[in-house]
UniProtKB/Swiss-Prot annotation:
It comes from Aquifex pyrophilus. Belongs to the ATPase alpha/beta chains family. PROSITE patterns: ATPASE_ALPHA_BETA (PS00152). It catalyses: ATP + H2O + 4 H(+)(in) = ADP + phosphate + 5 H(+)(out). It holds the Pfam family ATP-synt_ab. ATP binds at G163, G164, A165, G166, V167, G168, K169, T170. SUPFAM superfamilies: C-terminal domain of alpha and beta subunits of F1 ATP synthase, N-terminal domain of alpha and beta subunits of F1 ATP synthase, P-loop containing nucleoside triphosphate hydrolases. GO terms for molecular function: ATP binding; ATP hydrolysis activity; proton-transporting ATP synthase activity, rotational mechanism. CDD domains: ATP-synt_F1_beta_C, ATP-synt_F1_beta_N, F1-ATPase_beta_CD. Keywords: ATP synthesis, ATP-binding, Cell inner membrane, Cell membrane, CF(1), Hydrogen ion transport, Ion transport, Membrane, Nucleotide-binding, Translocase, Transport. This is ATP synthase subunit beta. HAMAP family: ATP_synth_beta_bact. Its main location: membrane. It is an enzyme of class 7 (translocase).
Amino acid sequence: MAEVIKGRIVQVIGPVVDVEFEGVKELPRIKDGLKTIRRAIDDRGNWFEEVLFMEVAQHIGEHRVRAIAMGPTDGLVRGQEVEYLGGPIKIPVGKEVLGRIFNVAGQPIDEQGPVEAKEYWPMFRNPPELVEQSTKVEILETGIKVIDLLQPIIKGGKVGLFGGAGVGKTVLMQELIHNIARFHEGYSVVVGVGERTREGNDLWLEMKESGVLPYTVMVYGQMNEPPGVRFRVAHTGLTMAEYFRDVEGQDVLIFIDNIFRFVQAGSEVSTLLGRLPSAVGYQPTLNTDVGEVQERITSTKKGSITAIQAVYVPADDITDPAPWSIFAHLDATTVLTRRLAELGIYPAIDPLESTSKYLAPEYVGEEHYEVAMEVKRILQRYKELQEIIAILGMEELSEEDKAIVNRARRIQKFLSQPFHVAEQFTGMPGKYVKLEDTIRSFKEVLTGKYDHLPENAFYMVGTIEDAIEKAKQMGAKV
């Protein structure tokens, strides 16, 4: 058995810990793990002990390394013993982790007892070689009309949910988790990066109630935790997802909420390590940090990892370096706007701003492509006419333009949909709409066949049959 290398703490500055390894031939490598025992006082005034993991970030000379703590550092003292792990922090993987909640170091935090995992994989792993990656394109049905029709997702793809605060990113993610688990029986990995602890708890309780928890593993590094935790928790989740892809041959979904907080934590870590900031105060290694996470998300010949990442846009400025660096890696962008949220259209996805490089005839087929393009054309024309309507009113439009406006309003409302995870708020049962039903329903709306139905009949329904039924309930002639 290899000798355990030990050092001692010489300095603690917030989440940064300097450790001295005297008389060792080789210092721990960058990104390798260290551990120590933290002694602190809990809320009730009782002393407790827990293992604190750290990650080596710099070699600072004189046999010293600078490490980033993966947890609170209160209770650490100078001279305290630190143990070198011999490599990166290792994470439990396998079916044993399903239904559980973990922290960044792979320790269970749901008070459900220890995890009897048969295998432990390092937190950092290289992305698959190019020869191992799959070139097959397979569309993933989400059951959400606006996504399936206008920005299709592929297995092994990367999707960004862009939006400011409070426009519905987390709810949309919860619905996608629900639909994948319930209708596809796929495994999901949920990574909470720097988001609200309350939301993490709510999501766990909702998944427990809806029965999808056995198909899911959760890894949390929430906003109350040190930057090292928020900066590395995405890698922990990816290691777990990679096991399901590479060993079990599964198509896995990884949900990262919020990838911007990962960048933000990287900026904090960078500042703590004394690096000079780059544009807008972000870390100089911004693109490298983002690339390390994104390159691990891909399809191989064995299985796939599809990533759906919520991206907070600071001050709704899409040109900010953080969202911009994430943009470069995405196959599809789903943009949520406050304008639609204010109109009560949920999901508040902008059908014109949102894109997918797989919305092309060779991937989705001619019929799907033509219906999607016609929907976009009508909505684009409606957007152009809105300025004229605001100044001159509807009366000044030609008959053709009036028909386009009326149809566009119905399409806009028809792109809304009641969610299963929001039933308790809306009082409306959630709808999962199959892709063929979505295409057929919009194709019929585009013909003008249902222009006579009231606009509100199209609001918060599933298929066109649901809209007809709602119109009947409203007393309209069908």
